[in-house]
Swiss-Prot record:
Record-given protein name: DDB1- and CUL4-associated factor 6
Keyword Ribonucleoprotein included in the entry's annotation: no
Positions with biased composition (Low complexity): 499-510
Disulfide topology: none
Biased composition (Basic and acidic residues): 288-303, 312-334, 456-466, 534-544
UniProt GO BP: positive regulation of transcription by RNA polymerase II; protein ubiquitination
Amino acid sequence: MARSGSCPHLLWDVRKRSLGLEDPSRLRSRYLGRREFIQRLKLEATLNVHDGCVNTICWNDTGEYILSGSDDTKLVISNPYSRKVLTTIRSGHRANIFSAKFLPCTDDKQIVSCSGDGVIFYTNIEQDAETNRQCQFTCHYGTTYEIMTVPNDPYTFLSCGEDGTVRWFDTRIKTSCTKEDCKDDILINCRRAATSVAICPPVPYYLAVGCSDSSVRIYDRRMLGTRATGNYAGRGTTGMVARFIPSHLSNKSCRVTSLCYSEDGQEILVSYSSDYIYLFDPKDDTARELKTPSAEERREELRQPPVKRLRLRGDWSDTGPRARPESERERDGEQSPNVSLMQRMSDMLSRWFEEASEVAQSNRGRGRPRPRGGTNQPDVSTLPTVPSSPNLEVCETAMDVDMPAALLQPSTSSTDPVQAQAATAAIESPRSSSLLSCPDSEPRQSVEASGHHAHHQSDNSNERLSPKPGTGEPVLSLHYSTEGTTTSTIKLNFTDEWSSTASSSRGNGSHCKSEGQEECLVPPSSVQPPEGDSETRAPEELSEKGTLPENLTQNQIDTAQLDNFPAEPLDSNSGEKNNPSQDSPCGLPEEGTLSETDRETCEQASTESATRHASTKPELPSQTEAIEQASTESATRHTSANPELPSQTEAIAPLAHEDPSARDSALQDTDDSDDDPVLIPGARYRTGPGDRRSAVARIQEFFRRRKERKEMEELDTLNIRRPLVKMVYKGHRNSRTMIKEANFWGANFVMSGSDCGHIFIWDRHTAEHLMLLEADNHVVNCLQPHPFDPILASSGIDYDIKIWSPLEESRIFNRKLADEVITRNELMLEETRNTITVPASFMLRMLASLNHIRADRLEGDRSEGSGQENENEDEE
């Protein structure tokens, strides 16, 4: 090897290291910086230690062992050299493990891990399983994405999650916390989902946080504190020293899937979902002088992307080394049998969304959306695409396409309640978190379908025009989202006016995985249960109270406008779904998704137009009483009727009855209070009536958005650095999973996993592509280099951990193959941006619906014909 000149003295240097004559780090830096060394990498070992996708891997400080976590909810400590498992730990997690770390300086005996249900476990491998199960933190609302330990600190660790908070825990203070709605350990409230964190190695008080608004925020932890320590700042801008965002993503919502500091702390590597990898210097400030986009430019960039194609859930044909772009498959005649059907469905959805977009444009600025045409049922209902407030950074656009109720009815009518089959279990349990792009664990990947009791009535048009209690018809709501772990999502809901399943009591917030976006928490459009037991509450009881669906619809909308709250999904007992004069109700938006009334809220918040609505509603008390009797979900009414609600609820309750100045003052006081609102998925409120949960969630969301808007305004006045992009690394594809890691390897290389099943390695300084390794049958998610030796560990959707080392005798980098893979990835990344993943139940429902519509038309034609014959007979 020395004779070839590629790595002179390598054997002698390795010999010196084994004899302890040279520092291992010197050998690592000397040879790891050479591209010929990188291009000799070869698969050395495969560790089959899990029964599910391996979502996190971590070397211990000495590089002897690997800690891994998986969909099988187990933690495993293995020896990659002997290929043996040291310890298998039943973690106590009930959902997919996303991140696990050894606590430093604990002799690898203490582990911290987090999972998709938001629970963090503090595990001591020397303690029994029952004791370890007691050491859990349930503080996060929604998914917890990552755990980060502090160098040389065995007692503290940080976490980030979907609720937009970064939390700091000290095991000397407590080793568990199951307090409901706990805010004691919040270090930073980002107002947007915090999906990744990183600590600067040489200066560990610098903390980088990646958020769902495409931003990377760097904080000085010395300026921060928690409520537990008594010095919580309560502002998302406190301690912020830099904020990075690529210019072309400033008005988009690409989630950060990975953050990584360089060893010297001088650069940060950030990987974006549905985009590329960027390198920036946190001390740079040259982007400050760039022009800030106007509100009109933001509005234009947030427009709905085209919907070109559908993908069935579980279809992983676009991942792995053998994946091909659609154009190439068409050219080679390799179309799958279901392509024709999927394409026809895609064309149909495209037409719906185009029509919805047109109506959304015409409805923008109106009080609420109105139905198209004068038919007895709305064909398409939409939400406007953007708010006008320039200070509120909006993650995404959304629209609800509500198909006629007939689309969900079976081909034969029935007067008996029919239980619609749920397409996913996401509503019932957080176990099925879809952040991991694993075929086995993707029950909620991009589309949610919730089943409810659907009372299928006869096809009498008079009944449809005049709905009454107990005769509500289900509505198919297609919620198109441009934010999530995929680039686009459709949410499918089967809802009924007067009934819902018991599962809705736990899951009014659900995870939507979008292949190519962030994972988003989406409350189903109409799954809130009525006050009390949703199964035993009879429709007749509600009808006796004299509240008509039409009145409820109008009151709900007026209330949403009056109180300036973000719109919340109406209770399944509200009558809006069956009111032919109204479109389907707007759902409480996921992060960044704004419904019609929510957009009005954003547009009017700066001027407090809600006070004007309040002063023009003298009939409010009577409406309140009627709606409360019907157990609907007006936030203001329920907060005023429930004195046991949290302080924010108490603060907002009397505002509707006060004069405008008092209302403004109260809102301002509440907004500046210490009760810091966080991003709360509706499913978090597991106790108490459904209407109470929704009321609290709406108020929390309202104040969270207010605080976020104010903090974004403050950013322009603060001395916060705004770095420019230093280098961009392309060629890989990051669109199907939320845990795609990018990492530094030594001082000269950058690497990342990819949806094509390869490991990509670039030159750090030139972005030249240097190496391509086939490492998974579907997706490579995790890459962790050995702390000293030139060894790399990788994992992904395959149920194993792969160990790579420079064993090839000569360079094996195939430039031609790499160029082909890069070209395909670029094409498929663009395809993924316009692809929506739907469950099989969605396709079956659509086919049944179209068949039912066709049958209805034929029946209608026959009825018209018989009617004409009868008229002729009467004339005779």
